[in-house]
Every structure is written in structure tokens, then in C-alpha cells.
């Protein structure tokens, strides 16, 4: 036998002659049948491998000869000559055929041809099976052999083979046999030829390369071969082209009809069609509903629509977009049409589930109208120091009520729910999510040291309007001259907050020029109290803001001169013992303040001034553990060391401040979280590796890694685990329980994370992307392993020779060379 093997391997590409073997005629005659078959299989496999690596060359002569001789070789396997009449063979010896033609043994020999040699005698099977029609009865076929289930079984076998996972408990030998069995179930080499198997592999790769929208549809049709896939794709492409042309023709026809009717049609433009050189307007990104569609929406959908549209408005305002109405920019002097908002009688406050049902276009118009009509609706102007208080006239009060009614329900939609909390009372339960309002993202609550601010409310014989309004208070004289300081904005937020029967309105003052101002603790200015008298009143006022507003309406009293925050508390005239800055009373919370007594005269109101940041709606600091006892709240700030809530001169104004870093908070949740960090109970640092944990439970689990503690042990195999969940997952291996099943292919898993990773093979999702090269991965561990190729990191080091590896499996294989047993090394 002469073999042409190269002695040296050049740098040129490998040729077929380099991997082929040739025989002379004498050597070929000495080979038996099995050796010839083995030679043919090896040569054909080498030829297929050369083609698969894109080596383009003409078919060698030896391959052509082997393919021609394929049909004649089965005769040497004792197949009768009449099964392959096209091959010319010498007639067999008559003595060898000692059985009659109708003998059962002859039928057995034919059955062997059908079952064992289908890959060779496939084209002749139809002719042979026609000789035995009784064996082809559909009732004799097994259910697995039915044609309707053949494609489904093939696809299921392919999925099982592709997604096979090695289980350590099964062992390598058993796992290999299972994988080989799955491969046989899918490819079926006993019943398919090599060409058919190759067709299956090409079909699978082609389907994986298709786009997602094509692949899902093609797989649903269950194509048998590549030709069927190509036909399906061509039909789908032609149908899509026909639909596109039909849509274009119908659109052109509609436009022609409209032109004939004389109707001026405008092209419909979407946000994606806005030219790049034109600025994006709110109408390009807004979604509108009519009244009928709005009624069909549920409370949750309305709330989501409310939040999305307000966030969009805030984003546009933050990048410099100015609100407009009717494509016309609004100015304070421009006339604005009155748009009556749609009210829901069941929702009167700023509850989460009670969003006013208005289309956003009217919401925007009402909000912008209030923003630009502030100067025309001035009421309750704050006076400069030294000027007497201006009395309200009947016209100003009626104008105030009109503006409140017009803005009712509109500002609730315009103002995003941020920065100001509104705590509601009446159900006795705490709301799941507090309602907050703000002008936009760039409008923060802030008090300036030199701006005069006071709390305003409404308490009178007329009912309180549960709406919202914005009023601009100007500094200056009575003649309307502008003042020197900036103009604060009074934001009135009425709601049923403090009592069920008595409603009240409160005002929060915000500086419109302070956009996106960080929350900085203001300086503290202490000032002595001032006393004012309140005239006769038949009103029951719950809050100091109601008392102050009552003073302004009746003309009694005067506003504070330089107070940044004015709060009036009703005090009985016969009570004594009040000191400067102190408030004594038997109460459990700031809400339980005795109302203003009817018909009382000469009662004094204590006015306490401070410049601390005011948070009007907060949780009660002191619980009812000392109910019935008198408490004295000093003017200086007090702090409970555990709840961290500070008091000022009254129960209303509270400031939250961390005691060891002097950082102020306006939100209770932020303050509690911050204090936990200071106390050390929220952040835990591992002394071994330096890792930080915000959860003590995770930290306790992490410590067991260093100590080697494994308290949860399997009673079946003795394996121990750090967490109980790991033991539960391990026990499913012994019990065989696989509770998680894939709805696509029917495969089951014993772990939730395993099925979530498996589902990505169906959806094609690759959520983990490399920031350097953009390559995507289905699992985070694959991304971590890939990133080491960029960084050069090798965290797994051999303790014997110091060689480093990127994967733990490589280290385990390397340790075998040193005679070390399987033992993973920790990451450095």
C-alpha cells in the first residue's frame, strides 16, 4: 500500500491529497468487504470536512469512483439480486437457493433488507414493500411511526440534544451514553442516509441564522427540508411586497378622493417623521384620548398615563421647551381661552387612584393658563417691612374664588407628584404611596432668608373648594412698584388632610427662579414670638393657616415682618404659663390642636418664627406611649435618638437631620436609611475580603464562605451546603423532581434560574453585552469570562507551579498533572 503523506507541513493550505490514501489494484483486491467499506467511509468523511472549511476544488476521481460503486456494494452483504436489478452480477449458484420462493425464511431475508439496509436500498423500498401489502396496514404501525407525529418527535429530540446538560451526579459515562442516545433519536442514522443527515444540520443552522420575525413563523410551519424553508420565505416576501403596494395604492386613492371633494388634507406626521432640523414639540410625543376612550380606562391606567405624560412634559421643559397653546407661545398678556376641566365627583383629593379624568391637552392648557395668568389673579400680597396690611375687598375675594374654581382638577394633572407629600386622613390607614406635587422637575421647594412667607388658608362660611391654584405674590408698595427681592410663588394645595369634617387649604411657597436647587440645610434664624388678636369669628379653624387667613379677611392683625415661616396656634385666653418659644398642651400629635372657640373674644395667637426648612406633612414623631401626660416642646430643636425627628417652636414645622453629620432630609424614608448607615446596621464590611453588604442576612451567608461552615447537609449523599435553598435544589437531584417546565419544548428543570437561561435559547435574547467589542451573551458568567480576554485577568492560580488560568475548569485539568484532586481555588 502506497500512502502519500507529506514529510513536512508547509504553510500552504491543506489539500485533499494530503489526507487521502490510494491503493493499487493488487492491494485493493486483497481487502475484504468490511475494509473496503471502512475505507470508503473515511474518504467520504475527509472530503466532507474539506468542503465544510470552504476548500473549493474539483471532486477527486477517487471520490467519484466510490460514489459510483456505492449502489453495487450491497450485493456483497447478501442482498438478493432481484432487489437491485440495475446492477449486473453473476447468477447465484442454484444449490445455494435451497428454499422455495414462498418459504417464510425468504420473507425474513427481505424484512432484514427493509430494516437494516434502508440507507443503501432506500430507492427500492417502495418496490419491495409492494410485494407485502399486508405489512403496510396503517393499523399495524406504531404510534411513534405515524407521519403526523414524526416532525414533532424529531424537533423534540433535537431540542433535547442541543440543550443537554451534564449532571455531576450521573457520571461522565452515563452522561455520554445519554447524549449519544439523544443524537441517535434526532438524526436516526439507521433510517437516514448521510445526505439526509447533512440536510438536517444545514436546515438547523439556516433557521438559527434567520431574523427573529422570520424564524418564529417558519418554525411554526414545521418544514421538512431546506427547499421547504426557501419556498416559505419566498412566499412571505412576495406577500409582503403585494401588501405594501396595495397599501400605497389605497392611500393614493383616498388622497385623490379627498382632493376631489375639496377637503384640504394634511399629511399625518408622527414623532419619528419630524425632521431633524425642527424642534420636537409636545404634540409629537403626546398621546390623547377622547371622553369615551377615557371612560374605558381603569384607575391604574389613568395613573400610568398621568405619570408618563407629566414626565414627558418635564423632560421637554428641562431641555428648554416652552409650553404653547394652539402652536402659539403664551405670554402673561396673551388672552387665554377658558377650558373647563372634566371633574370626577368621586375624586376630590390628590389620591393615587383618584386622578382627574381629563385629556392631557386640556390639562396642559389649564396648567399653562394658571402659570401665565398669575399676575392678573393676585390676592393676598405680602407687604414689605413697615407697610400696613392691605385688606381684602369683595372683588378680590370673588376673583380668588373664581380662579380657584377654574383651576380645580387641572393643576393636579399638571404638577408632577414630587417633593411635597400630602398625607390623607379619614380611613385610618396609611396610603401605600404618598401623593406629591411640584411645578416641574426644575421647581423645588425652597425658602429664601429674606423672602416674606406666610401660611394662607380659607375658613369661612363658604365651603372650601378642593382644587389647586397658583398665585404669584409680588414684593412692592401699594402702587405696584417692583420690589427688590425675588417673587415667591404661593402653591395652594387643598385636601382632606387633617380632619374628616373640616377642610383646609395650605400654601407652600416656592421660588420660581430656583430650578434644580440642591437641598441644602438653611441657616437657622430664631426670633421672638409676636402676639396678634383675632376678632369675633363663627369659624372652627383647625390649623394656624386658617387663623392667619381669617385675620387677613377680617382685617385684624398684621403679617409678620421678616418671618420666613409664620404659624398661628389657637390658644385659650384663660390659659397661662406660655413662654417665649414654648408651647404647652396635652396632645399626642401636631394634628390634635384644639379648634378656635366660637364666639371667643380677645384670644391671643402665638406666632413662632424660624427659618428651618419646613416639611408640612410628616409622620408623627412622638407615639402615644405617654398619653395623658403633658409634654413641653422647647423652641430649640429636639431629637429622639431613634426616630430622628426634630421639633421646632411648634408641632407643625419639623426638620429631619442626622445627628452626627448634620445632613437634613425632607423625606422620612431617606432619613431613616441614612441613619441606619451611620449606626452601622445597614452596611456590613467583611474583614476577610473587604466586601460590603447592605443586608445583614447576605453578610451572614457570606461569612460562612470564609469559615467553611456548611450547616445544611444532605442525608442521602452527605453533601453540605451554606444555604437551605441550595440544599432544597440539591434534593431534587435525588428525588428526580423537575418542577420547572419549558412551554416551548417541554423540557423540565430543577432550578428556576436554569429555565430562565433556557428560555433565552428560544427567544434569542442576549441581555449581557461587552462594552468593548459589543458582543452579546445569554449568561452573565459568559460575559465575565469573555471580558477576561480584554483585561488579561487570570484569577485561578495553581498552588504548585503558580500558573494562572481564566477558567476554573482549566485549573482543575491542570491540577491533574500534579496529582492534585478536584479542588477549586478561590478567586484572588
From Swiss-Prot:
Composition bias (Basic and acidic residues) maps to 384-394, 600-611
- Gene3D superfamilies from the entry? 6.10.140.140, Classic Zinc Finger, DNA breaking-rejoining enzymes
Question: What are the protein's UniProt keywords?
Answer: Apoptosis, Cytoplasm, DNA-binding, Isopeptide bond, Metal-binding, Nucleus, Repeat, Repressor, Transcription, Transcription regulation, Ubl conjugation, Zinc, Zinc-finger
Q: Which residues form the KRAB domain?
A: 14-85, 280-370
What's the PTM story here?
A: Ubiquitinated by TRAF6 at Lys-15 through 'Lys-63'-linked polyubiquitination. 'Lys-63'-linked polyubiquitination occurs in response to NGFR/p75(NTR) cleavage by gamma-secretase and promotes binding with the ICD cleavage product of NGFR/p75(NTR), followed by translocation into the nucleus and subsequent apoptosis.
State the Pfam families in the record. Answer: KRAB (PF01352), SCAN (PF02023), zf-C2H2 (PF00096)
- Intracellular or extracellular location(s): Cytoplasm; Nucleus
Q: Where are the zinc fingers (C2H2-type)?
A: 684-706, 712-734, 740-762, 768-790, 796-818
Answer yes or no on keyword DNA-binding.
yes
SCAN box domain ranges (all copies): 158-240
Q: What does this protein do?
A: Transcription regulator involved in NGFR/p75(NTR)-mediated apoptosis. Essential component of the NGFR/p75(NTR) apoptotic pathway: upon ligand-binding and subsequent cleavage of NGFR/p75(NTR), binds to the intracellular domain (ICD) cleavage product of NGFR/p75(NTR), translocates to the nucleus and induces apoptosis, possibly by regulating expression of key regulators of apoptosis. Induces NGFR/p75(NTR)-mediated apoptosis in retina and sympathetic neurons. May also regulate expression of neuronal cholesterol biosynthesis genes.
Record text on subunit structure and interactions: Interacts with NGFR/p75(NTR). Interacts (via KRAB 1 domain) with TRAF6. Interacts (when ubiquitinated at Lys-15) with SQSTM1/p62.
Q: State what protein this is by name.
A: Neurotrophin receptor-interacting factor 1
